A protein has these predicted regions:
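Conserved alpha-helical positions within TPR/SEL1-like repeat arrays
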Residues: 425-436, 459-470, 496-507, 530-540, ...
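Terminal, low-structured helical/coil segments at or just beyond the last alpha-helical repeat
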Residues: 574, 582-586, 590-619
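Canonical positions in the second alpha-helix
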Residues: 416, 449-450, 483-487, 520-521, ...
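Structural marker of alpha-solenoid helical repeat scaffolds
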Residues: 419, 453, 487-490, 524, ...
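Polytopic membrane enzymes that build or remodel cell-surface glycoconjugates and lipids
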Residues: 1-472, 476, 486, 493, ...
């Protein structure tokens, strides 16, 4: 890396100003709360995270693959937040903002050290700090993973520059360690070996310019050597990819989107590359979710995108003297590969958060190109300074406004509905927000619209079924739960739909069918205690007391529950096992001393009195 000193007073002042700019832009996040899109799975309803930083929680973090990812460091960072701030969202937002500010400063010093250009580096870092596309990563607590993996990525780039100055095993090991930590925060950093090859080309200059036949031959020889140098890092990437595929297979995340043909996915990927560039230049109408067009995308769009992408790629190859062009362009294209949608994960066409690091390639191209093409401009410093200031004010104002939309689930998804058509995710989550405030009547309309806009969206059918069941419209609710089972993406959602369908069937006194539904729920989620209890109740009604006792015992072992233990006692009574019934009643009373029915039956058994008659001898 360049020998310029990065600890001089000017650099420190610039870094401080970058932090101030970042804090000023994102200050509204401190008044934002949690939202009902992934924040429940990551924080608000995750009982491991809610315990704070514990040994059992950290052990769980290293083996957990929920939320379709393996990212133990992300889990641990959320646990640290709960340990420090409990469930105060301002504290969680403060941690995310700290990481983003840290990334901004790291980026500035990284570019400064690598290129020696102070003001160019500062401008790239400043736009990165306030660009509205990055709001999603900063304002969304669930996107801690993007911030954290980027921190380790930038640290790995610093370590790589240190290694390049004096190659050695210890220095390379530090690069590998930081890369591994980044992968343990979010697997999107999987492209780091490719990114390091780009840094070898520019700005590190480890590859010769392929301008002559002799130079091209040397270029390929050197490129092969540098690629082999990255082999240990590539092995880490492959290991991370394997773990990620396993995690997503367990939640059915990839398989659920296999109905999208490869041509459809490629068309959307090409168009998304162009849309990210459009939003980089004109970042308006941003939303938390952009519905996938599936097979409705006009053919001219991917064709136009492919043409423009090829033209600019050809332009970069024709201007190899400006190495930053090809390096920045390939950085943008390459870093988006894991999330561009060729392997479709999730239902989105694209996502703002995916541009967090790929956007850097475009920023470098723009800033370096403007600087290189304006040396003879009259009053160059004043003009470039004014243009830079206006750009930062523009982006910062838009980012602050976008941050305000993240205040709560209502503002977030109402805005998404305003700027994106047929946004079935926004409709569904807005409905969930109304459920949380006790307005199922308003939620109903949003769930219904979600199912109309996306008939194959299982979660909306499930939520609609819950509302209908609450209105005692059991037949309609049952149909919605069946749709949720048919179209559900994740095992947990499908298991819950089976469970609720069983409850509806119980209300209709269809005992055998209900029993089958609860059994399916347990098959999908063997640790779902409520389904064991529901199946036990059904078996008790059908006089299968041995099976009922087994299910009540299983449910109570998963989550100690006085009601489950009481009915375990009743089942054992029916089997003539009074000693076992006594044990169950005592355990129930230990959990709930005022459980009168358990106390009454326990006293009758102990005293030898006739057992009291229950008017309804079933759950």
């Amino acid at each position: 890396m360049n020998a310029i000193r990065i600890r001089d007073a000017s650099s420190r002042w610039i870094a401080a100003l970058l932090v101030v700019l970042t804090l000023a832009t994102y200050w509204p996040t401190f008044s934002n709360g949690f939202v009902n899109f992934d924040d429940d799975g990551y924080v608000t309803q995750n009982h491991f995270v809610q315990k704070g930083l514990t040994l059992s929680g950290m052990a769980w973090a290293w083996r957990a693959t929920i939320m379709a990812n393996w990212h133990p460091l992300t889990w641990i960072s959320h646990m640290v937040d709960v340990q420090m701030f409990r469930m105060n969202p301002a504290g969680h937002h403060a941690s995310s903002l700290f990481l983003h500010a840290l990334n901004v400063v790291l980026l500035f010093f990284l570019l400064l050290k690598a290129t020696g250009f102070r003001w160019r580096s500062a401008m790239v870092a400043a736009v990165f700090a306030v660009h509205p596309l990055n709001v999603e990563c900063v304002a969304w607590i669930s996107e801690r993973k993007s911030l954290l993996c980027t921190t380790f990525m930038f640290l790995a780039l610093f370590a790589y520059g240190w290694y390049v100055r004096k190659p050695g095993v210890a220095r390379y090991a530090l690069v590998a360690l930081l890369f591994a930590l980044g992968l343990a925060a979010k697997p999107m950093v999987i492209t780091l070996p490719f990114a390091l090859l780009l840094l070898d080309y520019w700005p590190l200059g480890r590859l010769p310019a392929p301008e002559t036949a002799e130079a091209r031959a040397l270029f390929w020889v050197r490129l092969r050597a540098l690629a082999l140098e990255k082999l240990p890092l590539l092995l880490l990437s492959l290991a991370s990819a394997y773990i990620t595929v396993i995690a997503q297979a367990r939640t059915n995340t990839i398989a659920a989107n296999m109905y999208l043909s490869m041509p459809v996915r490629i068309e959307n990927a090409l168009w998304s590359y162009l849309m990210y560039l459009e939003k980089a230049v004109w970042p308006v109408h941003l939303a938390i979710f952009y519905p996938h067009p599936e097979n409705t995308l006009s053919l001219w769009k991917p064709l136009l995108a492919a043409l423009l992408l090829m033209l600019f790629t050809e332009y970069c190859f024709r201007h190899l003297r400006q190495r930053y062009l090809l390096a920045g362009w390939l950085w943008y294209l390459g870093c988006l590969v894991p999330v561009i949608g060729v392997v479709q994960v999730g239902r989105q066409a694209m996502a703002d958060r995916y541009a967090y690091t790929p956007l850097l390639g475009i920023l470098v191209i723009v800033v370096w190109s403007v600087a290189d093409r304006s040396p003879a401009m009259a009053r160059r410093a004043e003009v470039l300074g004014a243009v830079s200031a206006l750009a930062l004010i523009f982006f910062s104002a838009l980012a602050a406004r976008q941050t305000a939309y993240w205040q709560n689930s209502f503002s977030l998804f109402e805005h998404a509905l305003q700027v994106t058509p047929a946004n079935f995710i926004a409709e569904n989550n807005l409905g969930q927000a109304y459920i949380e405030v006790g307005r199922p009547d308003l939620a109903y309309e949003h769930f219904l619209r979600s199912t109309q806009e996306k008939p194959h969206f299982g979660l909306a059918h499930y939520n609609l079924g819950v509302v209908l069941a609450g209105q005692n419209r059991n037949e309609d609710a049952g149909k919605e739960f069946q749709m949720a089972i048919q179209y559900g993406q994740e095992k947990l959602d499908v298991a819950q739909a089976y469970h609720n369908l069983g409850v509806v069937l119980l209300a209709e006194q269809q005992w055998s069918k209900a029993l089958a539904m609860f059994s399916e729920a347990i098959r999908l989620m063997p640790n779902k205690e409520s389904s064991y209890l529901a199946r036990g109740f059904t078996e008790f009604h059908l006089a299968d007391y041995r099976a009922a006792a087994s299910d009540f015992a299983a449910g109570a072992s998963l989550a100690p529950d006085p009601n489950a233990l009481f009915w375990l006692g009743r089942s054992r009574e029916k089997l003539g096992d009074l000693a076992g019934a006594t044990e169950a009643y005592r355990k129930a009373l230990a959990l709930q001393p005022d459980l009168a029915k358990a106390k009454e039956r326990l006293e009758a058994i102990v005293s030898g009195r006739p057992l009291p008659f229950l008017q309804q001898d079933e759950p």
